[in-house]
Amino acid sequence: MSVTLHTTLGDLKIEIFCESVPKTAENFLALCASGYYNASPFHRMIPSFMVQTGAPANPSPPENPKGGRSIYGPTFEDEIRPVLRHNERGIVSMANKGPNTNGSQFFILFDKAPHLDGLNTVFGKLIGDESLQTLAKLEGLEVDKKNRIKEEVRIERVTVHANPLAK
């Protein structure tokens, strides 16, 4: 199972770990399929660490708060799996504000980050050379003092490839 994030810088194809983290996978795939991530900005980037996205492009509280929400309500619980680690470039993981606060935001690693193991739910990884090239372009962008990318970069749309959760 995979999705392609078509961004303003190029494509990011993500393999989703559906069997290992089913609730997280269902949330991400449902948001992808619904168009939730369309026009979502990459709003935070820390060079040599990660880039973050997944907040709604047009927040309208309370249904669509600024920080985003899950398909289960505002947040849902972690699915920490010891075999899924923040151990390489291209790992995709849920952003959160502490234990069991997953919503819609996620990040992609530029490098391994073992300090996140046990804290954030890993649910996928980038696949393919084009994805890694796009990730390199993202990492090369300038950021301000608050780690906001100076150039606007967005997810334009998402393609879901063979969604096993589709009903």
UniProtKB/Swiss-Prot annotation:
This protein's UniProt keywords: Isomerase, Rotamase
Catalyzed chemical reaction(s): [protein]-peptidylproline (omega=180) = [protein]-peptidylproline (omega=0)
EC number: 5.2.1.8
SUPFAM superfamilies, sorted: Cyclophilin-like
Domain of life: Eukaryota
Transmembrane segments: none
Record-annotated PPIase cyclophilin-type domain positions: 1-160
Enzyme class: isomerase
Pfam families: Pro_isomerase (PF00160)
Family: Belongs to the cyclophilin-type PPIase family. PPIL3 subfamily.
Protein name, as recorded: Peptidyl-prolyl cis-trans isomerase-like 3
Origin species: Neurospora crassa (strain ATCC 24698 / 74-OR23-1A / CBS 708.71 / DSM 1257 / FGSC 987)
Gene name of the record: cyp-10
